[in-house]
A protein has these predicted regions:
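Bacterial N-terminal signal peptides
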Residues: 10-19
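Hydrophobic alpha-helical membrane context
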Residues: 17-18, 80, 276, 284
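Domain-terminus/edge residues, biased toward the C-terminal soluble/receptor-binding domains
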Residues: 157-161, 169-174, 178-297
Length: 297
């Protein structure tokens, strides 16, 4: 019996060695990147800047509220340089108040802190908050847009031009999936202390006129509820842009950034973004999984 047991142990050990050797020598199987149903998309590795997969990534497209990622980058830069403070009180102009589209619901003449306006812009996607911040920094939204373009040039966003701080439709206002990935990478890298705002799921500000109840607005990034690894960034929609989403997720020490332009619906932009992130986390390690990738710069 002792001899049989020794033989079994020897056979088992040899079998395990063979299995291990076979596993180590097996070719790495990497499938083709998934088809993304959108006008343009890109997926990059945050640390290296390598492109994992992309489609029409340089195409000039309407960015809608993805514009606010650049607006926030400029505001964060002003904060970091000490030109403004989170506690600064901003007097709301008529122009900011009457700006159309999604709103934080601020009122003319009221004083609102930079911190609250940032949250209203990022979480609630408030166009009114975006204009108020732009005016606080640049004096006029048009001047602030010039500042946005200067930052875009510094970051190497060669396929972007901003005419306003909101992303409302305007001639010659455009960006690209690649540029938005570059911007998201820079924002997370340069302003980790402020980036966390993008992970907040809701923002409460103001009161309903009839009931007096606080107005609670939810972050439009559905992935914040669906995937614990996702911690930002921003959605966007206009008729011209379609449904857009720039997202970032971190898992097992690796961070990925995806950008999707021109999806068909709120659900589609979340689904297609999730598709990209899942693919990247499953098959990307230290090298691009498709053709030899390039570094975003």
């Amino acid at each position: 019996l002792q001899t049989i047991n020794k033989s079994l142990i020897t056979i088992t050990a040899f079998s395990m060695l063979l299995a291990s050797t076979a596993s180590n020598s097996a070719p790495r199987i990497i499938p083709k990147a998934p088809t993304v149903i959108a006008s343009s998309h890109i997926l990059i590795d945050f640390d290296s800047g390598k492109v994992i997969t992309e489609f029409n990534q340089k195409e000039h497209l309407a960015p809608a509220s993805l514009t606010k990622i650049m607006t926030s980058y400029a505001v964060f830069s002003e904060l970091k340089q000490g030109h403004i403070q989170l506690s600064d009180e901003v007097t709301i102009s008529k122009k900011a108040w009457q700006t159309g589209g999604s709103k934080m619901f601020i009122e003319v003449g009221k004083k609102i802190s930079v911190e609250k306006l940032l949250k209203g812009m990022i979480i609630s996607s408030g166009n009114d908050a975006s204009v108020a911040l732009a005016e606080h920094i640049g004096g006029a939204e048009e001047t602030f847009a010039e500042l946005m373009n200067q930052y875009a040039e510094i970051l190497g966003m060669h396929n972007s031009n901003f005419q306003n701080a909101t992303g409302m439709p305007a001639s010659n206002h455009y960006s690209s999936a690649e540029d938005m990935a570059i911007l998201a990478q820079a924002l997370i890298r340069d302003f980790p202390e402020f980036y966390k705002i993008y992970s907040e799921r809701e923002f409460i500000f103001g009161k309903e006129l009839k009931s007096g109840k606080p107005i609670k607005q939810s972050n439009r990034n559905k992935l914040l509820w669906r995937d614990d690894s996702v911690d930002g960034l921003k959605t966007g929609y206009t008729k011209a842009a379609g449904y857009c989403l720039v997202a970032s997720a971190k898992k097992d020490g690796m961070r990925l950034i995806s950008a999707v332009f021109g999806a068909d619906s709120v659900e589609a932009r979340a689904r297609e973004s999730q598709k990209l992130l899942n693919f990247g986390f499953r098959f990307y390690e230290t090298e691009p999984v498709t053709e030899p990738g390039k570094t975003l710069s």
